[in-house]
Every structure is written in structure tokens, then in C-alpha cells.
Amino acid sequence: MSRLLCPSSSTSVVRRARPTFVLGNLSIKQAQGTGASSALARRRRSTFAATADGLHVIPLEQKYPFPWLRDACRCPDCVHPSTRQKLFCTSDIPVDIQPATNGVEEVGEGVKIRWSNGHESLYDWDFLKEHSSSVSRSEANKDLPRVGWTRASIAKERDLYLEYEELKTKEGLRKAIDHTCRFGLLFIRNVPNVETSTASCSLRTLAHYFGDIRTTFYGELWDVKNVSNSRNIAYTNLGLGLHMDLLYFQHPPQFQFLHCLRNRVQGGSSIFSDALHAAETLRIQDAASYSVLTDVQVPFFYVNDGHHLYHTHPTIEVSASGDVNQINYSPPFQAPLLLDTPPAFFTALHQFSNLVNSDENTYEYTLEEGDAVLFDNRRVLHARRAFEEIPGQGVRVGEANRWLKGCYIEGDTMWDRGRMLR
């Protein structure tokens, strides 16, 4: 595919003497001397200021470097009108690109820049505001802020439990996705549980409301029930501590569904803990320990049943800006630590473990037949209490008395669906 370059891409910058501070077609000094236009100059001076290092937008308290602005031009020569795809490379832009002399002008919609080679770009106020900070970018993308929770606070959320029928409407589905994005935990009641086959079960329909199912070596959908000679502790009746799934993958699944088909046992309640809340609490209580958990790589592995998977992750994964992106905590699948693991790591992990396992931070619920739970596998830890089968509970021959069916959901597809619904 040929690459169409914007006019400035192949034209060198013509350096000319120009005022240090330009507003429209007048420098400040020139504008102040015009008398009748002094009020206009004052108004413009409070909105935009062009200096040698970029465009300053006064109300937003933000500076936009000229190379960034040239790269962000959205005119038809720079961005294809129908595909909305960029028609040039960032590397095509001269690193020292500047506007032409007196080439910055405030217009009704925002600010127009005439570059040194004659190309013109228009940046409206909404665009500049959208890109002024990470918060404003998230708002423009219709992303929702994550809200940390404790046992007491999550119990008060009115959308923690929703009805399956609600998801068949756009408003109901939006409400479900919004709640999951904010809190990472959602229960759905009265999901049909008569059909149990993987091909036509209701979990498949339920999952597709939210996004695309992610296939792993467990398949598209999988069953969680007590089986003999299990190769995974989840397929026993033993208690299972707080953990996340598939951390031995480079990119573990973002969301997980569990649908309760049968529950005629004693015990077996599900436990959830917001590891994001625990991480933020640790950051406040002990910044040094928090830092250790963001730095030290922890290995996870699965070597069983014809598979050999291994990957390392920090316990707390942060973004370039320092925000917590996701958590990686799964003691059952943790491999031997690296030999250079510092002693401080053990203290830090002990503190983190105490936080996620504390009674005040764990939410417990026994799934009833027809209940489904959706949770963020990169944020919310899940566990299960041990259970005992009760004879004579009326299940069909060969069926387990406790039977969950599960699947994973790709995060991007659910976030995409949520943005469109908003």
C-alpha cells in the first residue's frame, strides 16, 4: 500500500524571525497598540498562547508541543474521511516543525495553525480538552473509573445482582457492563440451567451478550465439578484459596463467567476479594512494600496434562503514569521464586495477602442453581470453600451434585460494547 504524505512531510521548515508570542495575526505588543482591538487581545490572551515550545491553552493549563499538534492534524489530507485511518507516519514530521510567522489564529471553533509550508490544521476546543490529560481521554473514550470495594461497600451496590431478563435490553446490558467495569464483580440471577451441553447451554448465550469468548486449552467453555484423579484442584471438593486464573499465560483472560448448573451440596460458597482495593490500601500504609510488589517478578507455571506453560508477572502491575493496571496473584500456580528475589518481597507479599484475605475485604456468596457470576480476573480474586456431597439430592445419573460451567471473556470486546452502549 502506498503511503500518502501530508504536505509538511516532504517540505523542510523555513525558519523566519517571528514574535515569541503570537495570537491570531498580531503579536501581543502589536495587539496592545491597536486600541479598538485591545479587548479582543485580552480575550485571546486568556485562551491561547503560542510560544517557541508549543501552544499553551490557558483554561486547560496545558501545553501542546508543535510536533504533537502537527501529528494530530485531522484534515482530509492527513486522515482518510471514511476509514478514519491516518495517512502518514509520525516519523515523517520534522522534529523541529513550527508554525509560520503569525500562523496561530483563534477562530470560533478553536485554534487554526498555518504551518511553515502552508499546510493548515484546525483544532477545536473539544479536541484539545479531550487530549489535555489521562482523565479527559478516559472520559472521551467513555471509560468508567474503577471503584475499590470492601465487603460492606459492595453489598450496598444496587446493581450487584441483576436478572438475566434485564440483559436482553440495551439499558439492562449497559447497566451490567458499567457495574462490572466499575467494581469487577456482578451476579446474574435466573439464568436458565436445564440445558447443560457445551454447545447449547445458556452460558454461551449469556457470555455473548458481553463480548467474545476466549478459547484456552480448556476449550471455549468448561465444567467445574468434583472428579477423581483431577489434574486441577478446582475439580475436587477441596477448599480453594484466593487466586486468579491462568497467570502462567503472557496475557491472562480479563473476565471470567461461572454459571451454577447444580448445587446440592453442603458448603462450597464462593469468596471474592478486590485486589485493586488491597493494592491501593498497601500503597497508603506502606509505600516501600507496595513498590517492591510492583518491581519483583513472580513466576507462574502449569506443567500437567500435556501442557507446559510458564510466565512471570509483578504482583502489582502499574501503568507508565503509576496507576494500578492489574493484579497478578495466584498461589496455587506459583512456581519457585527467582533466586534474586529480595527479602523485602516476602514481607510485602505477606502484607498484601493479609489485606486480600481479611474478613472486611472478602465478599462471600453461595451460588444457587441458575445464578451466574462475572468477575474481572485481573483484579478480583476468587476462592471456594470445601464442600461435601449430600446423597439423594435428585440429580440425574452421572451428574455432579455441584456443577459450574465457566468461560473467559476478552476484555477489549466487552469494553468496546460498553462504550457503544453509553
UniProtKB/Swiss-Prot annotation:
CDD domains reported in the protein's UniProt record: CAS_like (cd00250)
First and last residue of the signal peptide: none
GO biological process: carnitine biosynthetic process
GO CC terms: mitochondrion
The UniProt record lists the keyword Metal-binding: yes
InterPro entries linked: AlphaKG_dependent_hydroxylases, GBBH-like_N, GBBH-like_N_sf, TauD-like_sf, TauD/TfdA-like
Binding site for Fe cation: H243, D245, H382
Pathway(s) of this molecule: Mycotoxin biosynthesis
Keywords: Dioxygenase, Iron, Metal-binding, Oxidoreductase, Zinc
Biotech and industrial use: The structure of strobilurin A was used for the development of the major class of beta-methoxyacrylate agricultural fungicides since its beta-methoxyacrylate toxophore targets the Qo site of complex III of the mitochondrial electron transport chain and prevents adenosine triphosphate synthesis. Compounds such as azoxystrobin (Syngenta) and Kresoxim methyl (BASF) are among the most widely used fungicides worldwide. This class of antifungals are used as effective treatments against a broad range of destructive fungal plant pathogens and make significant contributions to food security.
Residues bound to Zn(2+): C73, C75, C78, H119
Cofactor: Fe(2+)
Cofactor note: Binds 1 Fe(2+) ion per subunit.
Function: Dioxygenase; part of the gene cluster that mediates the biosynthesis of strobilurin A, an antifungal polyketide that contains a key beta-methoxyacrylate toxophore that targets the complex III of the mitochondrial electron transport chain. Strobilurin biosynthesis begins with construction of benzoyl CoA by step-wise elimination of ammonia from phenylalanine by the phenylalanine ammonia-lyase str11, oxygenation by str8 and retro-Claisen reaction to form benzoic acid, which is activated to its CoA thiolester benzoyl CoA by the dedicated CoA ligase str10.
Family per similarity comment: Belongs to the gamma-BBH/TMLD family.
Protein name: Dioxygenase str8
Designated gene of the protein: str8
